[in-house]
Structure formats: C-alpha cells, structure tokens
Amino acid sequence: MHGTTTIETTEIACDRPRASKAPPWQGTRKVAIVSAVRDRREITLQCLRSLDRIESAGLDIETIIVDDGSTDGTCEAIRNTFPETHVIEGSGDLWCSGGNNLGVGHALLDDPDYILVINDDTVFDGRFLQVLVATAEANPRTVVGGLLLLWDEPHRVFQIAPRWDTWYGGWRHLTEQTVWTVPEAPFDVETIVGNCTLFPVAAFREGGLFATKWLPHFGDAEFTPRLRKRGWRLLIDPRARVFNQPNEVPPKMSELSARELYEAVWKKYNHAHNLRNRFMMYWLGAPTKLQGFVGFVIYLVRLALQAIGIRSAPRRERPLREEYE
C-alpha cells in the first residue's frame, strides 16, 4: 500500500484566515513564481490578481511572466496593473516548455529557495503557497504539487496522480475524483501534472530543465518522472487547493478530415493527438524505455481498434483515499 511511506506534514488550514498566520518555519523563504503565457490577457491578469491576494507571511515572492509573443496587449496590461511583476518577452516560438525554461533560468540567477511553476489559467486558495512550502520544508528532496480542481465545478478534481500502466497503453488518468475522495494528507504520486508545482531550487540544479527539444508542450509529463528516477519524492498536498480552467476537449480523430488528421498527428507539436509528442512522453517519462516503447505500441493498437468501433469496457474508479489507507 502507498501508506507504508511516512510523510511529514504541518497543520495549516486551507481556508483563508482573517489575520495572517505565522508559518511553521523560521525566517523567510524566497519563492520565484514562473508562468509562460501567450494571448490570454484577461486570464493572465486574473491569475495575477489571485496571486496578489495570497498569504505571504514568511515568504519573499518574485513573480516572473514569460510572454511569448502575445498580440493582445498582455505585456502592457501586466506592466500597467502589476508593475512589480517581472515580464520577459519571448520570440513567439518558445512554446510552453521553452517559456518555462526561460523563466526558470531567470529565477535561478537570484538563487531562490523554491521555484513555483504555474499555468496562468489558475486561481488560488489564499494559503496554498504556505501549504506547499511547509510540506517541502518538512520533506527534503521533495517536489510538491497542489490539488488541481475545476474552477467551474470546484468540488471536482481536474487532474491528479496519473499512473503508468504499460498494458493499458501509457498513463492512466483518474477522472472521477472529488475533494471528498482524495486523501486528507499529502500523498506520493508517480508524476505531477504541472499546473501548479513547487520545486526546491536544487531540483533544477540537479535535474536540469524541461525537455524543450522533444516536448515543446507537456514537458511536465517527462520532468517530474525524471526527478523521481533521480531519487526525488513527488507529493500532492490536497490542502493546497488551486482552481483551473477546464481543458478544451479536442475533436476525436474520427471527426477530423484527412488533412486535419495528418497535421494533428505529425505537424502540430502542441496538438493532443500528436504522435511524436506521445512517443517522447512515453519514451522519456515511463519507468523504463522498454515500458515506454511497449506502452506506445499498445496505445497505437488501441487507436486502431477504436477506429473500427472496438472499445474497452469502462473501468470502475475507486476513491483515491482508499488506496492510501
């Protein structure tokens, strides 16, 4: 059972207190918050407004936004509304992994204690960052992710704790979890979905950066498993709640024209159906390269079967809390 591993925790409530509460650590921890954005001005501003309201006792926070070629006035709006935010302008071809790497590289120059990598389509519970830092302080060599919830259905989990299953054909995602079915204490996972992840600075100095060459998008699917292979622990702290915009569901392959399908699977590296991305996520992120290769082949077989109308039976999903009891 997962519960055989002990996890150090601290008593921090997730609800925003009426008065600022002293953190459980001594002194100040320096945290750089990094987010790569493009052409989502209002969403980015909403994210920054949310960050501006969080509890920051015991924290020295710097926010770094990498704007990769926005044409909707994102840079100007950030500088006018949040002048203390550091904005780095990209060339327009960084994509998500490259943008995050540029921001992380800038953050490393100031030698913070932690780097928090976030998506901009996110709003935050008032105590989330204090919770993440407290858990990281109590558990050395640990990367900590927040509990990702849907902002339009805030009781429902957005994405959490994907598990590698070679014979299923790759990462198996949980889709039916809620705030009532997840564990109450921090719990170990195989990979962390990168919408809100706190890295001790040593994780980047030891493990490198996101794999921009192979995964211009979805770099989190490879980076946190890479750290885990190096002996880092991956935890989700369910008390650190963050609320996310639901993903846009891409059209099914069967709904695409031949040209659209070709571009999706071969040309567009940011597309959910892109096979190159899928292979590299498996090859680099699976427990072993052999498992990654076999998992990818099985994924292709499943695609072929679905194309002729053969689908596997739905699998009952247990409450995640039961697996950690």
Located regions from the model:
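A conserved acidic beta->alpha catalytic loop
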Residues: 50, 67-76, 92
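Short, acidic, metal-binding catalytic loop of nucleotide-sugar glycosyltransferases
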Residues: 50-60
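Glycine-rich, basic loop-to-helix element that forms the pyrophosphate-binding segment
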Residues: 90-110
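Short beta-strand-to-loop acidic/aromatic patch adjacent to the donor-nucleotide binding site
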Residues: 112-121
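Conserved donor NDP-sugar-binding/catalytic core segment of glycosyltransferases
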Residues: 123-165
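A short, conserved alpha-helix in the catalytic core of glycosyltransferases
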Residues: 191-192, 196-199, 203-208, 213-240
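Non-catalytic, C-terminal membrane-associated alpha-helical segments of glycosyltransferases
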Residues: 255-325
